[in-house]
Amino acid sequence: MIDADRLITAAGGRDRDEQMDRAIRPLSLADYIGQPTVREQMELFIQAARGRNEALDHTLIFGPPGLGKTTLANIIAQEMGVSIKSTSGPVLERPGDLAAILTNLEPNDVLFIDEIHRLSPIVEEVLYPAMEDFQLDIMIGEGPAARSIKLDLPPFTLVGATTRAGMLTNPLRDRFGIVQRLEFYNIADLSTIVSRSAGILGLVIEPQGAFEIARRARGTPRIANRLLRRVRDFAEVRGNGQITRQTADKALNLLDVDEHGFDHQDRRLLLTMIEKFDGGPVGVDSLAAAISEERHTIEDVLEPYLIQQGYIMRTPRGRVVTRHAYLHFGLNIPSRMGEMPVVDDVVDDPADL
């Protein structure tokens, strides 16, 4: 199983880290760094909804973990000047669980459902009329005496977040008027995020120190902030408390996070594909068995960044490593791979951005 304390996983961390994440989380679109298209569109939609004094259209936010889906949901509520009620798909086990939340919403409030793809079908059925007509259908009684009653709900905005938009049913997906995909962040934006977080936490950090952390953060703000906290520990214990590029480099090397942002889990996945499956193609179930991981861990946690950086390809026959992976480990590239082009995404200096 994947390590619970894996530094570069984008999953939620320990309670203390989560508290610090909340402290450095932006509260407005003006403070929201990166995702320029999403930010510009949401500014427009929110301004229009506020001008009409209406609830914002239901909004679906999807993308890999750690890119700020929850942050954006809270910003939407803040910008709309309304309250937000937060829950998650697995928590809503029965229609009554959802009904209890919906009936306590005020006009134009935001209901945020994380992992919305994990809603049970019976709960999802209750959600349809609530989203479309702002009505709640409730069954009273049991057996032949059971009857349905309709309750009117105040207008509200459902914000759904998911890492697996393809698992949403078509009827649910079609009821979202706004759909936003969050992309991996570039190093420049991540450097800005690291510098901002350091300022909020009262840390002294040089621009190149922020850059060094950012380039190893796998394009993910949550990972960047987590690495910042661990580099801070290193700087306080083995340095003078100031985060320089040299300090960040030493700290991250000690933590086994290389210049590509890979840790031992990523390297194990790539080496398993190369050594046990001759580079692929290999099915995800076979790969999961070989490295003793669950299928969804590979698909949701390990693969997205490796694919985005060009180390793995998905093909109809299975996963295949690219020339990038062989070069990363200093291995000879099999002649059968041909002359595929190599694109080096590692930036060695901030001036190259």
Swiss-Prot record:
Instruction: Give the protein's biological function.
Output: The RuvA-RuvB-RuvC complex processes Holliday junction (HJ) DNA during genetic recombination and DNA repair, while the RuvA-RuvB complex plays an important role in the rescue of blocked DNA replication forks via replication fork reversal (RFR). RuvA specifically binds to HJ cruciform DNA, conferring on it an open structure. The RuvB hexamer acts as an ATP-dependent pump, pulling dsDNA into and through the RuvAB complex. RuvB forms 2 homohexamers on either side of HJ DNA bound by 1 or 2 RuvA tetramers; 4 subunits per hexamer contact DNA at a time.
**What reaction(s) does this enzyme catalyze?**
ATP + H2O = ADP + phosphate + H(+)
Give UniProt keywords alphabetically: ATP-binding, Cytoplasm, DNA damage, DNA recombination, DNA repair, DNA-binding, Hydrolase, Nucleotide-binding
The entry's protein name is Holliday junction branch migration complex subunit RuvB
* GO terms of molecular function: ATP binding; ATP hydrolysis activity; four-way junction DNA binding; four-way junction helicase activity
Gene name of the encoded protein:
ruvB
Q: Which domain of life is it from?
A: Bacteria
Family per record:
Belongs to the RuvB family.
Residues of the region (Small ATPAse domain (RuvB-S)) are 186-256
